[in-house]
Amino acid sequence: MVHWEKHEGELSVVGVGAGSNDIWGVNHLGHIYHWDGHKWHKVDGELTNISVGHDGEVWGVNKNHNIYRLDRSNNKWTQIPGELVQVSVGSHHHVWGVNHLDHIYKWDHHHNKWDKIDGALTNVSVGKDGTVYGVNRGHQIYRWDGSKVDLVLGELVQIHVSDAEKIVGVNHLDHIYRLKHGKDWEKLDGELTWVSVGHHGEVWGVNKLHHIYKATL
């Protein structure tokens, strides 16, 4: 049983970093916001999707599928080669994404290039431990085993991985689920269109009205 608390602001995508004092999101206008534990700060730039890792690494993509990485020392965005529609950051070492053709990519931070992964996904998420899950156009769920993607029981349209023990997602009916013991999906109360889980089980999400909610697993 989780207790959802409504949070101030409006977003369409939200991401949890090291904790509830490092929350990033974008709204339906592409505006970027950072919650520091006390208030929302508007950040320069425009993005349609954003993700933050446990180490504070922030990446995003814009409506033209351009990819950006934030330098948090000066709050400036640096463009990264390639094109994606969604990006996921577990940490500096773990960045994945998908493009408009459902192609899957893994960032090689040693050589600053994208490696294409076999398969087709519309949404992907990587945790700080390198755990990767994703969903495809048919709402099927897949897990990366280090060399290939394997089908997982269940149906979702969006999934978020903090680590192997903390995985949440939503389906096409806005129902919210958490993965227990790596195999059982537990339905949570509430309705959300996007959900994100942090290292300590803090969950943030948004609904179809762009309202923001938070809870703890």
Curated annotation (Swiss-Prot):
UniProt entry keywords in alphabetical sequence: Cytoplasmic vesicle, Lectin, Membrane, Repeat
GO CC field: cell surface; cytoplasmic vesicle membrane
Location in or out of the cell: Cell surface; Cytoplasmic vesicle membrane
Region 6 X approximate tandem repeats, annotated ranges: 2-217
Residue ranges crossing the lipid bilayer per the database entry: none
Sequence repeat boundaries on the chain: 2-37, 38-74, 75-111, 112-146, 147-182, 183-217
Protein origin, superkingdom: Eukaryota
Main location: other
Record-linked Pfam families: Tectonin (PF19193)
GO molecular function, one term: carbohydrate binding
Signal peptide: none
Purpose: Probably involved in bacterial recognition. May be a lectin that function as part of a transmembrane signaling complex during phagocytosis.
Matches recorded under PANTHER family: DYSFERLIN-RELATED, FISH-EGG LECTIN-LIKE ISOFORM X1-RELATED
Family: Belongs to the tectonin family.
This protein's name: Tectonin-1
